[in-house]
């Protein structure tokens, strides 16, 4: 099952935008993702929804952060996260794609900085693969703003992800040996910038139950879409769920 990297970004922003100190919420939801890989149908996957904001650390979905410095306007933290992007040839309908090597999800470690203003929050982060699957790293720059309309909160976000050459080539490149097995042309992917937009809605029911839905859209650059593994130039993600706020 392939889960797009943008789901991670989509998850993290709404929790960061609405969390308060020492707030814990746990829930479950479903994520729908249009995979850019050829031979995949749309994916729907059950997911946990986890958020915790403490004085020294936080959990924002797949990211654990250890706060190094925090003030009214700035937060700097070390991060450990799980990168869910993967490719499983046995889960693909295309014969040529079935001949390719598996690309594994991986663990990442890095740093994240948040800057808060009245008009919104800016996030800048970078994280490297620590399991030596891709030997690459990923960066992110985004801005988001929470708007309150009665009990409903809306959080639009705009951002860009950066994949270095090693990361891009691991997930989207095709080696010479893979090319001979599959008949697909060999391809060496370059570093890539992936812009995205998202909108998150949260609505509390009573004191503890919170309904959440998020939609995200990303435009894939030619460094990715030129790969014979890819058959679309955009990706859409939708997440919905319910959580219990303690």
Curated annotation (Swiss-Prot):
It is a peripheral membrane protein. Keywords: Cell outer membrane, Membrane, Signal. GO terms for cellular component: cell outer membrane. Residues 1-21 form the signal peptide. It is found in: Cell outer membrane. GO terms for biological process: peptidoglycan biosynthetic process. It holds the Pfam family MipA. It comes from the Bacteria. Belongs to the MipA/OmpV family. This is Putative outer membrane protein YiaT. It comes from Escherichia coli (strain K12). The gene is yiaT.
């Amino acid at each position: 099952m392939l889960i797009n990297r943008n789901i991670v970004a989509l998850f993290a922003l709404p929790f960061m935008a609405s969390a308060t100190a020492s707030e814990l919420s746990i829930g479950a939801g479903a994520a729908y993702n249009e995979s850019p890989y050829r031979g995949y149908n749309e994916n729907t996957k059950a997911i946990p929804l986890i958020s915790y904001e403490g004085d020294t650390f936080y959990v924002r979905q797949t990211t654990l952060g250890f706060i190094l410095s925090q003030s009214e306007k700035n937060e700097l933290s070390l991060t450990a996260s799980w990168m869910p992007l993967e490719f499983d040839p046995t889960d693909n309908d295309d014969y040529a794609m079935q001949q390719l090597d598996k690309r594994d999800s991986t663990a990442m470690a890095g740093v994240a900085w948040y800057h808060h203003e009245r008009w919104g929050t800016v996030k800048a982060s970078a994280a490297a693969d620590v399991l030596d699957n891709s030997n690459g790293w990923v960066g992110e720059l985004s801005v988001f703003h929470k708007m309150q309309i009665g009990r409903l909160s809306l959080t639009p976000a705009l951002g860009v992800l950066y994949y270095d050459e090693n990361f891009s080539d691991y997930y989207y490149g095709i080696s010479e040996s893979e090319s001979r097995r599959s008949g697909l042309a060999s391809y060496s992917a370059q570093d890539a910038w992936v812009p995205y937009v998202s909108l998150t809605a949260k609505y509390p029911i009573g004191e503890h139950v919170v309904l959440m839905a998020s939609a995200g859209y990303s435009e894939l650059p030619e460094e990715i879409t030129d790969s014979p593994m890819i058959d679309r130039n955009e990706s859409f993600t939708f997440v919905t769920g319910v959580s219990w706020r303690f």
